[in-house]
Amino acid sequence: MELKERFLKYVGFDTQSDPESETYPSTAKQLILLNYLAEEMKELGLEDVEVDANGYAMGTIPATPGYEDRPVIGFISHVDTSPDMSGADIHPRTVSYTHLRAHETSA
């Protein structure tokens, strides 16, 4: 699956947060996406994949042989969306612009 296809799949998940919740993640709906992401990470070859009790999906990519002593990097993001708008029944679309130009401005 291409990157754009993956992103469009992810935004189709209803991950609306609940500001009244005292749990992490704030809704069970967010766990659906987290578990989906964990399965994708496994399919992509990541190791030690897990979703922890606080709603973090984690996995590791082994170092390239010979580079095990190099610094590592981590990426983090959130899966919840605003409680102010419904996350249900989202139909994402892409719009391609083939010709964009900035208007000239004067100082």
Please identify what each model-predicted range represents.
Residues 22-70, 74-76:
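A non-catalytic alpha/beta surface segment that caps or lines the substrate-entry region
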Residues 2-28:
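N-terminal capping segment at the start of a domain
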